[in-house]
Design a protein with these regions (language model features):
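Alpha-helical scaffold segments of alpha-solenoid architecture
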Residues: 1-2
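Outer-membrane beta-barrel pore domains
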Residues: 5-196
């Protein structure tokens, strides 16, 4: 069981302008992250592990990113009047992952396999995921499944494959024609790691 906290400090002030009628609304932020998280890891037998994580970004910037643009739109026309920005709720994330085996680069013929589910509300993910399985784009405002496997055919060589599917937006995103739901395509990655 673990708990953690991440906070940005001494950051420069960032200002965002949002159109509102004929003018702009201004939002300024100096604290990007104020993240609280908890996690648990449970060993199942000798070779399986279940991992669960949950967290929230409680900064004003996180709520801003989780919000959306407000439009005045007459149905059946292409006319939109932008009416500013609406703050969203506190963005949160959670993930569940099941790992079986352990691909150890020092142990030939060792292997691993995993499946996970991820949910990251827009504004909860701050970049740099450390997974190797998916790019950052598949973690910001997205929910998805990933499965993967690794195999060590000989010492110092690790082969891995990952497949992310059913990646969908957790909320509507701003587009030129108002807020729209979206879905990303599936994502596959194969990689080889050799240790010299």
């Amino acid at each position: 069981l673990q708990a953690w906290y991440l906070r940005s400090f001494n950051g420069s002030k960032r200002t965002f302008l949002n159109a509102n009628g004929n003018g702009n609304d201004e939002q300024s932020f100096s604290n990007i992250a104020n993240v609280f998280g908890i996690g648990a890891k449970y060993q199942i037998g000798e070779s399986a592990v279940l991992t669960l994580d949950y967290g929230q970004n409680r900064s004003k910037f996180g709520r801003y990113m989780n919000g959306n643009t407000v439009y005045d739109h007459e149905r059946g026309t292409a006319d939109f009047t932008v009416k500013g920005h609406q703050m969203g709720g506190t963005p949160h994330f959670w993930m569940a992952r099941l790992d079986i085996g352990r691909a150890d680069i020092d142990v030939p013929k060792s292997w691993n396999a995993f499946i996970d589910y991820k949910y990251f509300a827009h504004g909860s993910f701050l970049g740099g995921n450390g997974t190797g399985a998916v790019p950052d784009r598949y973690l910001d405002g997205i929910r998805s499944f990933t499965f993967g496997a690794g195999y060590v055919p000989r010492k110092d060589l690790l082969l891995e494959a990952f497949y992310t599917f059913d990646a969908k937006g957790t909320n509507k995103r701003d587009t030129l024609y108002g807020n729209e739901s979206f879905k990303l395509g599936d994502y596959a990655r194969i990689q080889r790691t050799y240790r010299f």
